[in-house]
Amino acid sequence: MGPTASGKTALAIDMATQYNCEIISVDSALIYRDMNIGSAKPSAEELEMAPHKLIDILDPSESYSAADFRRDALLAIEDIISRGKTPLLVGGTMMYFKALLEGLSPLPSADEAIRQQILAQAQTEGWEALHQELCNIDPVAGERIHPNDPQRLSRALEVYRISGKTMTELTQTKSAALPYDVVQFAIAPNDRKVLHELIAKRFNIMLEQGFIEEVARLKARDDLHLELPSMRCVGYRQCWQYLDNEFDHATMVEKATAATRQLAKRQLTWLRSWPDLQWLESGVEGNLVTLMRQSR
């Protein structure tokens, strides 16, 4: 685990190529095909050296829930173990980790028709009005979910409209926790400034690699828009808005790196309260040895 740009992928590939491990990606951006540069997806050469499960499994027009991830990850874990290898789960989507380790409440599957109804309502009335609707239906969820978080707000309303029960009611029970022993590590720089520098450096590299052109190709499709989970991934939204001439290139870079720093902050907030977690410092020699020694 770890915040974005902390060096998780490089360490995981080192581990997978030197030990009897196979990687399962725990990343809500890497699941999408044709989103390679902005998601910092491992290169074709890296994937050949160390294949990753749960990468490139969806089109950007599709949605994917934590429940979907848990189902697919459990199947991947069983497959890897059956071949005598050790599953190595790597990523920064903390909700996916939480769902896998602790189990999930029995929430209804996504309903695209209802989701589109909610989106249309948001476009006419605004997300603030929908947030007030949620507060009236489910005050606990309304307090927890910010009006500027359309993905979670939409899901809470969708659950209620499908089932007639609130998210709070349905989350009182959970499925069984992960039936395996898990050793958990997090990697991050000790200094926040170093992480911010890594984020800025990586985004500049993405631009050099053709990130704007990647987003332009996605934007040229007639089935993608900014309300989709794929297009809400950090960097993609800001670059899309730049291509729409909402702001200039320098502002796009500033907004994208700021959004990435906010993502890293949220990830670190999760990790600081995560139980049974062992920490590694980014860029330190010997991390792989430490990882293997403490995993035994």
UniProtKB/Swiss-Prot annotation:
It catalyses: adenosine(37) in tRNA + dimethylallyl diphosphate = N(6)-dimethylallyladenosine(37) in tRNA + diphosphate. ATP binds at G2, P3, T4, A5, S6, G7, K8, T9. Pfam families: IPPT. NCBIfam families: miaA (TIGR00174). HAMAP family: IPP_trans (MF_00185). Catalyzes the transfer of a dimethylallyl group onto the adenine at position 37 in tRNAs that read codons beginning with uridine, leading to the formation of N6-(dimethylallyl)adenosine (i(6)A). Belongs to the IPP transferase family. This is tRNA dimethylallyltransferase. The gene is miaA.
